């Protein structure tokens, strides 16, 4: 809600209906004809995050977004069936992307480890540079 964490979004599980909030955390309780997963994607989208930044910047020198600012967010709300369809599709596709990212991160970690080892061997004298002939 404030500062660097403004716009962070999460879904509160239904088994935590009485979760606590503070003056820096807001909770949106959706009506039954709204899909929480769809609204998670909406609220984390670049379009809405830009709105959050714009609305919070207008309020003070320290970025803050109150409930009135939240009410001013412009979001598309299709029928529940379409919300569910969009959320399911995004869940499936972003899971695939996350799997690829995890593989790439693992590969990058191994390359970074190799680089550190490579540099270490030369700066500690374990290996020497061969002179060109």
Where are the regions that the model predicts?
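Short, ligand-facing micro-motifs at secondary-structure edges
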Residues: 2-21, 37-41, 50-56, 60
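Hydrophobic residues in beta-strands and at strand termini
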Residues: 12, 30, 75-77
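Generic alpha-helical structural context detector
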Residues: 26, 40-44, 54, 120
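Positions in alpha-helical segments
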Residues: 23-26, 37-38, 71-72, 95, ...
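A short glycine-rich beta-alpha junction/loop motif
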Residues: 5, 18-26, 57-84
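Amphipathic alpha-helical coiled-coil/heptad-repeat segments
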Residues: 76-133
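Ligand-binding loop in jelly-roll beta-barrel domains
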Residues: 30-36
């Amino acid at each position: 809600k404030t500062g660097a964490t403004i716009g962070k979004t999460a879904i509160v599980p239904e088994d935590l209906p009485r979760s606590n909030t503070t003056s820096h955390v807001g909770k949106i309780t959706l009506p039954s004809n709204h899909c929480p997963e769809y609204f998670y994607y909406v609220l984390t989208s670049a379009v809405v995050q830009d709105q959050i930044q714009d609305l919070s910047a207008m309020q003070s020198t320290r970025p803050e977004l109150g409930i009135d600012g939240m009410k001013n967010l412009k979001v598309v709300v299709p029928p529940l069936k379409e919300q569910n369809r969009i959320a399911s599709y995004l869940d499936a596709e972003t899971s695939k992307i996350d799997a690829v990212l995890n593989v790439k991160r693992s590969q990058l970690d191994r390359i970074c480890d190799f680089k550190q080892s490579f540099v270490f061997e030369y700066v500690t004298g374990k290996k020497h540079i061969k002179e060109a002939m």
